[in-house]
Amino acid sequence: MISKYLMVFFIIIIAACSSPNKILKSVNTRFPENPGKIQKLTKGVFWLSWLGKDTVLHRMESINALVINLESAPLTYDFSWFNDHRKTLSYVADSTLAVAAVNSGYFEYLNDGGYVSFHKSKGQVNQEVTIPENHVRFWKHQAAFVQNGEKNFAIIQGNQNVYKQLPIENIISSAPLLISDGVPMGKYFVNQKEGDKSNLPGEHPERHQAGFGPRMAFPTTPDRRLILLSVDGRSPSAQGINAEELTDLLYHHFKANQAINMDGGGSLTMFVRGATPTGVVNYPSDQRKINPDGFDHIGQRKIGMALLLIPKRKVLLRRMEKIKVTVDSLAMDYTDNPK
């Protein structure tokens, strides 16, 4: 009888495994003509990428994922804030010798209210939500990605009062919450059958979450993996994804039991040192403001916060120093109050 229960237990664990190779194989079922690529960056850290026709969504998609084994990866995680002097991700990642990095929370500062998100790093509050509760963007801080201990990450629901009282050193608020305790909430919170959302303000939650666009997500898995995932958009070669579809991708193929949507759009940037001249591996959408047909790795938006993966070991830091990172030739400033 004990053997029977043990067998069931191990079957469940194996089924929920989110190893990089299992993820690659699973997502490849959606890209039969253009299977993904996998590259080991350092111990416990893998970069996965797909570019081509997604046969589930029936659209062209560009997906990049950093899959991190929290138990074995020799990394420190820097919840970097530089919203007082915005920079490109590749500049910040290069100057800190990061092996990889992504943009993180919503950093905009609005003339009609101020900041839309909360940010705390190394125990210091860098940014507080100042927009009023009736503001169309108030929803953007209703969840948070937090680090509680060197290797422990969680995704929580809350508000600024909750975040300020938490005895946690690193917090980035964002929204929407996509998966909570194994429940794929992102599949249900927007009614896709209510018709065209174009009459709503661009940052209204229903329009934001129903629209196909560039998106960043931070999921975690039951087997102690952190995944940083980007899906490009606003191009015929990468047509974007909505919150429901993103939830489905993370839940079924990455086996995530927690996930949060982070800042996307033109801010979406993923950096892998040495992968391209600038380190950027996704296709920043702001470049198409200059060249409508542009589809390459330049045109980063200057952002105000990021999550940096920095090596602990001196030998890896020295290796990072030797990899040259070039300046983005088309870095874009962000307009906080677009018309």
PLM regions and their residue ranges:
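Conserved beta-alpha junction segments in alpha/beta enzyme cores
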Residues: L51, V56, L177-D223
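Hydrophobic h-region of N-terminal signal peptides that target proteins for export
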Residues: F10-S19
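Zymogen propeptides
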Residues: S18-I156
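A substrate-binding/cap region within the structured catalytic cores of diverse enzymes
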Residues: P132, V136-G195, P205
